Amino acid sequence: MLMPQESARMLFFPQAYADGEGAQWSRLPYWWQDVELSGCGLCSATVCIDLLTNRDLTPRDVLTRYREDGMDGAGASKVGGRNMSVLLNEYNARAFGIRSFPIERSVGAFRQALGQGDVIWASSSDRQGTHPWHYADGSMEPLDPCGIQHPHGHIVCVWAYEDGAFLVKDPLGPSQLCNNVRYTDDQMERWLAGNDHQQYRVSAVR
């Protein structure tokens, strides 16, 4: 990871308006809706890019590049919500200086990748409400009024492991709740149990 540690801790892009933090991109058309409703992958991909390359891109910048290159547009695009698919490695290397690799859905694999300076574009879902998302203030209060979080899946960036916990940048809400959320090994194991979607280890092109 090229970004200095202090800057890395502060880096955060919410997909929603979030008291103005996401004002520049939350309403931009993306996927079948907009960034606020469908942009967790985009925001997490932008975090991965900036952490690994020390660039200063925002989700708006990345989406603009997609459009310039003909890579946006829901069903018509091979990008879709899968920003880190290995099918896009050539494009991502050229456009953003990163590559992705499939990684096992396990705490051990995540810790190994982070220890080698990579970051993880990670997905899960909470269809049964059995392994809720955590927030930086220590709460597990669902943001969904129905009490079930992310029933359709969600994507975050796991960027560090320190003092026995993973640090997660979750684009769902404002920075005070969702930046650098700590997940213990046990919490991460339960989070990973949410689905069997492929996880991606993301590296800088060297």
Regions found by a protein language model. Give the residues of each.
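Mid-length scaffold segments of soluble, non-membrane domains
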Residues: 73-104, 115
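Extracytoplasmic/secreted envelope proteins and their assembly/folding machinery
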Residues: 41-49, 59, 63, 90, ...
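Extracellular/periplasmic catalytic domains that process cell-envelope and extracellular macromolecules
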Residues: 5, 111-119, 149-152, 159-161
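Noncatalytic regulatory segments and standalone regulatory/sensor domains
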Residues: 37, 133-150, 157-206
